[in-house]
Structure formats: structure tokens, C-alpha cells
């Protein structure tokens, strides 16, 4: 008669079952997160998604996302499971600000490059105002604290010659000290065009390179 000690094998099998159960529970939870994101997108549509958590969990979550949701992921942040709400919010805001900065800098450089090559873009107050008056603006771009006063904004005839101070703008009488930006933005929106407001470094870059105003054009 031989006596076989199976306690070690039993313990190993028990650990394996526990591990499988834990993994299945985690995957079930991640699927619930994905379902919640889909429901949220239906009620409150969003265009960017930041994932946070332990790196392995984040990777698995991203793998489970549908293609449309995966394309909206702008960053993944490694956070411990026990991270509190304040830590999560701070990291989310930091990542979002970095994303905004990169996006706005990229937009600004693309605008300046296209304008320099005369490829469906213009940079500078006179050219942008002229494009707005002609209904050619596709996307208006300016810094958050920007102002364009009538006294500093000449009309530029189509033949490119001369220029006089504006006394009327988009059918509205104006004074030399009036800020035209509100009228410009309203007209842009009315024409079905987009408006992009720059912050921080991107806004400074546009001010230095193009007096703070530019636009991508329809034609």
C-alpha cells in the first residue's frame, strides 16, 4: 500500500480555479464598463475617451471596445485600483489639457503652413475678414482673448489694391472702436462653418505669426 500526498496538487488546482474565477469576474466587469460607455454615448455623445487603471486592465478594456469607441481613445493613464476620485479627476484633467495643447498646436501649424502655400487657407486679419465677407470661411481660428477692432481692420478690394477703414461690417454699421469678432463669429456660424478657439501657446503662436486671426477656406 502506497500513500500519496495530494495536498500540494489540490492546492495548485484550487489556486488555478480561483485565478480563472477572478479573471472571468474581471472580464465580466469590463464588459459592463463597455456597455455603460455605449449607453452614455447614446445619451451624452462624447468625442474623446481617456482610459485609466492598472496597465493590464486598461489594455484589456481597450481591446473590448468597439471600433468607434476605440478611435476616440486619446490616452491611457496608469492608476492604482485604490485611486480616489480626486486623483482620477486630476489625472484626467492633466491628460485632457495635454491633448488639447497638442491638438491646437497641430491645428495652428497646419493653418500657417497652408496659408503660406496658399492652399485653401488664409492667415492675418485683412485676408480672413475678406474671406468672411465673401462667404469662403470653412473654419475660423483665433485665440481666446482675441479682439479685432474696426479701426485696425481695412477692407481689401478683390484686386488686392489699397484698403480703407471699415465703416460697415456684414450689413451692420460699426464704429472705429468696435470689436468685430462677435459679428465675425456669428456670420461664420450662420454660414455653417466651424469656429476653433485657441488657448495658451497655440494662441500666442497665431498672434505672433498672423496677428491672431486665420481661417481654412471652402475654396
Stretch-by-stretch model annotation:
Residues 1-219:
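Terminal alpha-helical anchor/extension segments at protein ends
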Amino acid at each position: 500500500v502506497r500513500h500519496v500526498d495530494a495536498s500540494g496538487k489540490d492546492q495548485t488546482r484550487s489556486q488555478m480555479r480561483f485565478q480563472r474565477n477572478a479573471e472571468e469576474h474581471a472580464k465580466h466587469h469590463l464588459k459592463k464598463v463597455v456597455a455603460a460607455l455605449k449607453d452614455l454615448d447614446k445619451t451624452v455623445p462624447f468625442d474623446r475617451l481617456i482610459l485609466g487603471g492598472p496597465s493590464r486592465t486598461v489594455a484589456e478594456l481597450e481591446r473590448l471596445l468597439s471600433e468607434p469607441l476605440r478611435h476616440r481613445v486619446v490616452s491611457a493613464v496608469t492608476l492604482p485600483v485604490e485611486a480616489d476620485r480626486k486623483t482620477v479627476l486630476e489625472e484626467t484633467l492633466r491628460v485632457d489639457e495635454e491633448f488639447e495643447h497638442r491638438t491646437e498646436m497641430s491645428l495652428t501649424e497646419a493653418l500657417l503652413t497652408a496659408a503660406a502655400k496658399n492652399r485653401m487657407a488664409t492667415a492675418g486679419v485683412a485676408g480672413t475678414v475678406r474671406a468672411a465677407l465673401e462667404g469662403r470661411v470653412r473654419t475660423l481660428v483665433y485665440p481666446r482673448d482675441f479682439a479685432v477692432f474696426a479701426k485696425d481692420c481695412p477692407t481689401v478690394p478683390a484686386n488686392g489694391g489699397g484698403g480703407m477703414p471699415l465703416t460697415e461690417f456684414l450689413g451692420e454699421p460699426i464704429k472705429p472702436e468696435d470689436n468685430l469678432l462677435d459679428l465675425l463669429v456669428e456670420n461664420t456660424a450662420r454660414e455653417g462653418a466651424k469656429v476653433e478657439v485657441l488657448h495658451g501657446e497655440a494662441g500666442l503662436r497665431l498672434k505672433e505669426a498672423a496677428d491672431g486671426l486665420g481661417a481654412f477656406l471652402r475654396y
